[in-house]
Every structure is written in structure tokens, then in C-alpha cells.
UniProtKB/Swiss-Prot annotation:
Tagged with keyword Methyltransferase: yes
GO molecular function ontology, one term from the record: rRNA (cytosine-N4-)-methyltransferase activity
Protein's recorded name: Ribosomal RNA small subunit methyltransferase H
Pfam families xrefs: Methyltransf_5
Keywords in alphabetical order: Cytoplasm, Methyltransferase, rRNA processing, S-adenosyl-L-methionine, Transferase
Biological process, per Gene Ontology: rRNA base methylation
UniProt xrefs under SUPFAM superfamilies: Putative methyltransferase TM0872, insert domain, S-adenosyl-L-methionine-dependent methyltransferases
Amino acid sequence: MKEEETTYHVPVLLKESVDAMNISPDGTYVDVTFGGGGHSREILSRLGDGGRLLGFDQDEDAERNIVNDPHFTFVRSNFRYLHNFLRYHDIGEVDAILADLGVSSHHFDDSERGFSFRFDGKLDMRMNKRAGITAADVVNTYEEERLADIFYLYGELKNSRKLASVIVKARTGQKIETIGEFLEIIKPLFGREREKKELAKVFQALRIEVNQEMEALKEMLMAATEALKPGGRLVVITYHSLEDRMVKNIMKTGNVEGKATQDFFGNLQTPFRLVNNKVIVPDEDEITRNPRSRSAKLRIAEKK
């Protein structure tokens, strides 16, 4: 494993996910979450002269991990624009698409990015540092009801309304700009026993809102469904229930809402066949080596 992979992000379920892509040496593949490049390097190692791989990442920091390989093309973009960039690169159908939806270790460990409550720093949380609102913008400008909805929907926090109320009251006196200031406001709401878990949910909710993660995932999954050729594989690693539900729905019904559609004769219409009915999870050895892989779930579907 290359040094940049271990410092930026350790690839999760590496062999299992790339094996699931059913790589053909001359095939065309997409890694929509390039990150540290771990999965992409493994894919490239299995390609021949006619093979091709596109790697997507919206974070400029990921560009330093770009693979020097003639079969690789890096796309600095949010994966929600998958359809646009496949057209731009004159690619019709692809053989497999891989998505590792976990936040890179680099983001959690870089105090300047504001993703973790372990460090003080600016409340930022943007995956793309050049675009969008920050977490500070969310906590300082959103109405109380909207804040409560975000914490409830994206963090699944039971005390979302109380949390929103405390934040709104605190910001009337002074703008909340740093993680330290934010923690001082919200920590009293959580008991010491569950503090870390509850804070993780709060930060997850803000990160999802800042980066519009659910909307982006929906657009990517719909584009992936269209882009895959018959027999092509959709391979996705999820880390929390919200994204996992969306992925499970698209694979089972062909839409993220999970609404089953039937043809005139009552037959279930779905673009995919499930390759693994039971999710694949990291073994104890991988969890020991990389504790952040603990919540990972691998789902695989094949286009009909």
C-alpha cells in the first residue's frame, strides 16, 4: 500500500469491492470516490491495454493522489455530475461503477477542514473548499425549524428541536464560528456516556447538509443506473443508514424511494439483479487494522 493511501485514506473492503466489479482487462470503469486512490490503483492493476478508468473527486486535496497511468482520467467534480462527464469524455456505457461513500480519513484528521469534533478550528465541513456554504453558515443563518429538521433527518437525533433551540439562542449574542464555540453550546445537552456518539450524529447531519450529500447520491445513483451496460456492476460501500437505505432501494426497485413498479402483467420492473442478498462487511482483521471500516456495508447489483 502506498504512503499517500495510508495518510489520506485507507481503502475499505478493497479486494471484496474490486472483485465485485468483475473487471475485464479491456473494460471501462468508474471510481466515483477517488480519495486516496486505493481502489483506483487496484482497478488499474487489473486492466489491460484497452482498459479505461475514470476517477471522480470534488476535493482539490485528492488531486495530489492522482495515478500516473495512461488508462486513468481524473475528473475533479462532484459525482452527481457523472452523466455529464461521461458524455464529455465520449463514454457511452460502462462495465462497472464503484462508490465508497465514507468520508476520507484525511478530512477527519485535518483540523482546518472542520469535519471532526476532536479538533478546534473553523466550522467548515465543505468537501469542495471553493464552493457552497459552510457549517458555520448553517448554524448561524438557518431558521430554528429547518435546523431541527436537519438534525432529525440527517443525524436521527431525538432531541433535534431542543438542539436547534439552544443553537438559535446562543447565536443571537455572538456568531458561532469555531468548533470549540459550537461544542460549548451543545455539549451540555448530551450525557457523558453517549456524548461522543451524539456529537458524531450532530456533525454528520451538518456535513450532509453542507455538501448536499443525499441529493448528490440520488443523482449519482440514477445516472449510474443509466450508464451501466447490461451485465455491468454497481458496487457501493455505505456507512450510515440514510445512504444505505437509498442504495438498497435503487438496487431493489430502480429508484431511491424504494417504490416497486410493475408492468402490465404485474411483473416487478427493476433494472438490477442483486449479486449479494446479504451485505458484505469487513472482517475482524480489517476492523482491527482500520477501525473506521467498522460500519461499512458493501452492496452489489448487476444491470439486467
